[in-house]
Amino acid sequence: MQKHLDSILIKPAGPDCNMNCTYCFYLKKLKLFPEKKVHRMTEEILDKVIRQLLAQTLRELSFSWQGGEPTLMGLPFFQKAVDLQQKYGRAQVVGNGLQTNGLLIDKKWAEFLNTYKFLIGLSLDGPEHVHDKYRYLRNGKGSWSKVENSAKLMLDSGVAVNALSVVNDYSVRFPEEIYEYFKAIGLEYMQFIPCLETSSEDPSKSASFSVSADPYGIFLCRLFDLWLGDFKEGKPTTSIRFFDSVFYLYAGLPPPECTLLEECGNYVIVEFNGDVYSCDFFVEDLWRLGSVPSGNLIEMLNSKRQKSFGEKKKALVQDCTECSWLSLCRGGCTKDRFQYTKDTKLNHLCSAYKMFFQHADSRFKKLASDWKNEQAREYQARQQERLEESSRSAKKIGRNDPCSCGSGTKYKKCCGR
């Protein structure tokens, strides 16, 4: 069965960025494009990407704009993108997400983002001492004050903003401080991304700034208790993407987070030059699927190479296949399997996930049970309302009126007999 491409990740400025963060894995991607110092997507490639995606018979589609730093393209580029979406759209619901470091966001940007309802992922690790540990400007100074000001500007302008916080060897110590900081400045939607980069000396080991498994497990447990403690009337008041995704699994729904899926390969990445890859973490020659100028995105999504990439996630070690948490973890993200176990690879964060699921399991089960019961009650209430409405309608029908069942005969000779 052919897959549909309902979401796509576009990197219009490639790996280019106006910051110099210590832990950035995108900097390595500069080696893929040695022929240019500045990388910018042309209007022709932009047109083809949007036209191909919107040619599908799907009701909802989403565009995710990332980098590097996508705002380096300038506001006119994104206005053009919206214009093309409106030009090629066929009454679909089109969503746009923009991941940014926030440095270039000003009033005009904020007004544009609010007007077209962009969902923003803002790279902000936490309060000043956390954020400025590794996130530097090009001059070597910290970027926190500029990024926080951008957050406040966008929130004041009505823009939906998610905090994207990289959990590293330092920030992992401060879950309470980071969580409360985000709430205090109005960032109630949060995504915590474990920093896992391999050492340049030994690829089987993690880099010094990467988060270790056990501290990350403790971080997740403490964060979960904070999240749960803020519930009101049985419902969350803050959103943490990983917890939301795990809840989906307990509720029997597909999770939004791809790391928890059984198989990868449900979307593709388009680089600035139109090259298409299997995943943002695998922008390398082995997983290059083709090129937008000469190919079709839907065909690339359904190609043998993309299928092979997706099935890589299913290749699990015995420790995983025999684990009681497999139905929740699914081995985690493929890129994080660099901790060797026997002759294959185990996810570097395996012990962290085990710690977290053991800590949260009973409470997730209760949350899922309460949600299902609420859904059942709402369904029964809707059914009862329909029955009552039907009964009221029936009482209004005269004996000589057409029967409401649609038979075409009089009520007295049909349902009114």
Regions found by a protein language model. Name each.
Residues 137-145, 152, 156-259, 263, ...:
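Radical SAM enzyme [4Fe-4S]-AdoMet core and its adjacent flexible, acidic
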Residues 283-394, 399, 413-417:
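Flexible mid-to-C-terminal extensions adjoining Fe-S/redox cofactors in radical SAM and related proteins
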Residues 3-44, 415-417:
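Canonical Radical SAM [4Fe-4S] cluster-binding loop centered on the CxxxCxxC motif
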Residues 12-20, 69-72, 264, 320-322, ...:
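Cysteine-centered iron-sulfur cluster-binding motifs in ferredoxin-type domains/subunits
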